[in-house]
C-alpha cells in the first residue's frame, strides 16, 4: 500500500535543506556507492556524502519530522529508521527498475536492519524539473509519483521501482528505509485502517458534543433535559465503540509486533 505524506517539511525547512544541497561546497559522491550489486548498473545520480559537515543536522531535521508526523508513525510503525540519503538527479540521470536491498547495514550501529518500507521525500517542486518521476510497480500496475516539495511517499520495499530520466532541471530528494515493528504489509495496513477509524470516531464524538451543547443553549428547560439525556446515551455508545476499536488495535499490535 502506498501512503502519501503531505507537508512533512515546511517552507523554511525546505529552504534550509535546498540551500545546502545547491551550495558549491556540498560534498557529492557517485550514487552507485550506496547501491546494491544488482542495482549499481541501474543507478545514475549524485548523493550527499554522510561525511559532509552539514549532513547530520539535515538528517536530524528529516528524522524528527518523520517521527512527529502522525500519518508516517501510524502507517510505518517504525522500529528503526535508516539515516537518510540526499540525492540529486541532473540532466540525463535516472535510476532504472530495481528493488531495494532486503538488508542494509545501519551506518551508526553497524547492525543489519531489514527494509520493510521505503520513503522518498521530494525537496523541490515538479515545475523545477522535467522527468524524474518515481514509478512504483505493484500488483495493481505502475504508479507514477511526482509530488510537491515537502511531500513524501511511503511504500513497501518489496516493490520494483525506478526514477525516470531527468530531461531538464534538477531533481532533489531524500530517501530512507524503515524496519517496522510489524513485518507484514497487510498487517500494517489493517492496523493503520483501525487507527484512522479510531481517530475519526473520536473527532466525531467531539463534534457531536459541541453540536449538542449549541442545541441545548437554544432549547427550553424541558427540551434541554431530554436532549441532554439522549446526548449522554449516544455519547456512551460511541465511547464504547471507540474503546472496543482501540482494544482490537492494541491486541492485534501485541499479536503482530516484533519488539
UniProtKB/Swiss-Prot annotation:
Coiled-coil region: none
Cofactor note: Binds 1 Fe(2+) ion per subunit.
GO molecular function, one term: 2-oxoglutarate-dependent dioxygenase activity
Xref: InterPro entries: Oxoglu/Fe-dep_dioxygenase_dom, PKHD_C, PKHD_hydroxylase, Pro_4_hyd_alph, Pro_4_hyd_alph_FE2OG_OXY
Annotated Pfam families: 2OG-FeII_Oxy_3 (PF13640), PKHD_C (PF18331)
Keyword Metal-binding: yes
Chain segments annotated as transmembrane: none
Domain Fe2OG dioxygenase as annotated: residue spans: 80-180
The enzyme's E.C. designation: 1.14.11.-
Keywords tagged on the record: Dioxygenase, Iron, Metal-binding, Oxidoreductase, Vitamin C
Named cofactor requirement(s): Fe(2+); L-ascorbate
PROSITE patterns reported for this sequence: FE2OG_OXY (PS51471)
SUPFAM superfamilies found in the cross-reference section: Clavaminate synthase-like (SSF51197)
Record flagged with keyword Iron: yes
Superkingdom of origin: Bacteria
GO annotation terms (biological process): DNA damage response; intracellular iron ion homeostasis
Annotated residues for binding of 2-oxoglutarate: 171
Binding-site list for Fe cation: 98, 100, 161
SMART domains, alphabetized: P4Hc
Cystine crosslinks: none
Name of the featured protein: PKHD-type hydroxylase PsycPRwf_1523
Lineage per the UniProt record: Bacteria, Pseudomonadati, Pseudomonadota, Gammaproteobacteria, Moraxellales
